[in-house]
Each structure stands twice: as C-alpha cells, then as structure tokens.
Amino acid sequence: MRIHTLSLDFNQVICLPTVAKTRLWKAVALAAGLALGALSYPVHATTVSGGDTVRELYDALLSTMKNGRTLGKSGRFTQLVPVIHRSFDIAWMARLSVGPSWGGLSEAQRQQVSESFGRYISATYADRFDSYDGQKLEVTGERPTPSGVMVTSQIIKANGEPVKVDYMMRRNGEDWLISDIYLDSAISEVATRRSEFAAILKTDGIDGLIAALDGKADMLTGITAKAF
C-alpha cells in the first residue's frame, strides 16, 4: 500500500497532450472492495452512522489488500467499484468538483461526469492500495457538523507511522455517504479536484474532462471505459 498524492496527473494520459498542468496536493486514497470468487463480505445493510460506513470500507479494504497481488490491478478495480459507489456520494462530489460549470450541463453530461469520476476514484485506489504489510485502519471517532457528520480515523502504515484521515459524511436517504476526505484535517479532496478540474474545463470543456478521467482510469487498470 502506498499513501501519497492522488492528484490527477493528466499529462500522463497520452491521448490528451493539451491538458494544462495543475498544482498537485497530497491526498490519501481510501477505498474498499467486494469479494470475488472465494472471498465474501457481509450483505450491505443500512448504516446506522457515518462511522459504520467508514468501518465497512476499512474492513473491505483490508480484505482486498491482503489479496491484492493475486487479484492484480484489474481484479482490485473490479472489486472496488461497487463499494466505492455505495460508500461515496459520487454524484455530489462530482458536482462540487466541477463547480459553476455544473449548472450548464445536460442531465446526460452530469451522469457521464459522475460515472467517469467514480471510475477514476476506483482505479486510483486499486492502483495505490495493492498489498498488505501489517497496516491498520482505524475509526477513532465522529462528531456532528453543520453539514453532516465528521468521522475521524487513522491509517497506521507498516512502519508504524500514523496518517490522520477524516471523512465528511452526508445523509443520503437512510445512509451516510462520504462527501469529502481530509488529510491531516486540512487538505480537502473535493477542493483539490475542483482546482484541477477548473483548468481542464477551461481548455477542453466538459468532454475533455470526461475523456481525461476515463483516460487516467484506463491507464491505471488496463480496462477501457465503455462507450456511452
């Protein structure tokens, strides 16, 4: 498992050489996976609290990491997609990340951006969380906020170094879903994405953003996005 920046380095996507460089911020990739074959996880139930959502993610993530090398990058990606979509408020995060441009998008474009955003997140996590070397993932508490609930946690790396990771949770129906991630209580994942997306939208428009997200996911997983 490698904990480091997850910023969109779209200059590595060969098919999009014109995308402007954006400032990279450190963030932590946090994800979870469903089992394939012999692996099994409990049937998903309505979460009682935001902490339950994060604990479920962490339990599944550890199981995926322990089988990471056997699954390979495409197998890890396939496992991560369903849990990412049931644990993260992908559409909400995509909307905030796109910013003011969201209001001018058609419903079809909004759906495409949300799907590509979720696919990119899953691919990045599958790439970063690829093995297990004794790491610990722990929920340490939760507290109410004006916009929902903040769940605090830490990832203890193999060398014993703790990394503080907090989750902003948003109520969606009966479930609490992750709407943002903060590294060291300061670096917002959504704010980082919004800064990066703004540069891409300015030069390449919404189609360029969708292509960049899919291109990055393709590069990380070797699985080409389906045509809409």
Regions found by a protein language model. Name each.
Residues 29-38:
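Bacterial N-terminal signal peptides
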Residues 47-125:
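Early exported N-terminus immediately downstream of N-terminal targeting peptides
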Residues 162-192:
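Short beta-strand edge/turn micro-motifs at domain boundaries
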Residues 39-45:
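Sec/Tat signal peptide C-region and signal peptidase I cleavage site
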Residues 122-163, 213-228:
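Surface-exposed, charged secondary-structure patches
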Residues 48, 63, 67-71, 75, ...:
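Surface-exposed, polar/charged faces of alpha-helical domains
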Residues 182-228:
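Low-complexity, intrinsically disordered terminal/linker segments enriched in charged
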Residues 3-29:
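Bacterial N-terminal signal peptides that target proteins for export
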